[in-house]
Amino acid sequence: MNITKLLNKVYFAPRLKEIELYTEHAGELQAGVLKRLVRMATNTEWGKKYDYASIRTYEDFKKRLPIQTYEEIKPYVARLRAGEQNLLWPSEIRWFAKSSGTTNDKSKFLPVSKESLQDTHYQGGKDAVAIYLGINPESRFFSGKGLILGGSHSPNLNSNHSLVGDLSAILIQNVHPLVNYIRVPSKEIALMSEFEPKMEAIANSTIHANVTNLSGVPSWMLVLVKHILEKTGKQSLEEVWPNLEVFFHGGVAFTPYREQYRQVIKSSKMHYVETYNASEGYFGTQNDPNDPAMLMMIDYGVFYEFIPLEDVGKENPRICCLEEVELNKNYAMVISTSAGLWRYMIGDTVKFTNNRPYKFVITGRTKHFINAFGEELIVDNAEKGLIKACAATGAQVSDYSAAPVFMDEHAKCRHQWLIEFAKMPDDLDKFAKILDDTLKEVNSDYEAKRQNDLALQPLEIIVARRNLFHDWLDSKGKLGGQHKIPRLSNTREYMEEMLKLNFKE
């Protein structure tokens, strides 16, 4: 028996029996999570403020607590970072996951507790492996090492009490020492802050390793893979790592990168598993290679609620728990966690495709959309359009961003797409038409606004120069880690910055 089969039998397979309970007992599991979270936080400052001691049911919880955004919890975070404790959660909070900012802040700093690390983030990683091994019983996953591509961390500049970093860096820093024997690169290299020297160091330290699995954000992993191929002179990654079998990816949609990965990893035996491990918690794992939807992980330290997308921003939005969601409807996710986030709206939107068990796809961000003219375009629409346009024209998209062009003396309103192609389409006009037509097919509001070109003219595509989006992130100090390109924006702020860089000599 190989080591992978032995570990699976003893350590991972038993967990699958518990995950099977998700199908029939979702409501009970989530009720148990809420009860546990409320009980643990009863004597915190937050728990006393909202009288957690008297909360008995979900309805009590729902009526008592308002929906929170980062602006509401920011004063608590500032106090935690200064060293105060027992504010939002009873255990010590010293780590803060640095996430992309709000309108008023460059970055958000989200509390990370020992419970959220162990029972949510690390449990999510273990379960992803358990699910993968359950699907692939002949795997030799543990015959080699896992390459984990993460961000960096640094001491809090304003205090000696807290440490800040990308979530991935926090996970690497705090992982059980035994895990370091089955992962590469070394912790010192993995936590380097300068992106390009880090890529070089990772390549040098892993080229001769026996890598069987990859974990990271697709965009940044692709940069590393291409660098390794260039450095070794190989045509595909399996020539460097012949035992490579799976890539656990998350952070950004995989769709724009899928074809590029096929070009650099040609093996038909390669597996791709989507995971949803955000700074706020670990929420989902793909459990069927033929279904892009992810299984919602419902027995961690996360209680879920959902706001219909059309109600986001309203004074009294409709809010439902997991058992009340409808299939194929867009919701903004609201979470309460063992890191002390309470009814916190994380900014992601999801759509459920199944409720036995609960499976979902990420459809976008509550702030990443275009609704300048009533068209309500979301990232999920954009991804579907790009898939069709690429398939019909032989194109490969590296990165993209889109924004509205408002009516002026020269032209009517339209959407402007800035696209960096890894492979140009055979016919750019055809690509644009198919993208436009597909958006009409998947979004009736967009179709209505495009009718007879009255409200919206046909979309415009501007070809981005090579490495434009990389350079834009670099200009923001956001290379590597979990930094992302804003796919859709309802204003022109990002687009104008990118266009300026695009035409810069």
Model regions and ranges:
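Short, basic alpha-helical nucleic acid-contact segments in DNA-binding proteins
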Residues: G124-V129, N290
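Long, hydrophobic, well-ordered secondary-structure blocks that form the structural core
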Residues: P111, E115-H121, F248, H271
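Active-site diphosphate/adenylate-binding microenvironment
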Residues: E28, G32-F96, K108-V112, D119, ...
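Conserved helicase ATPase motor motifs in RecA-like P-loop NTPase domains
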Residues: F96-T103
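Conserved AMP-binding loop of ANL adenylate-forming enzymes
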Residues: I131-P177
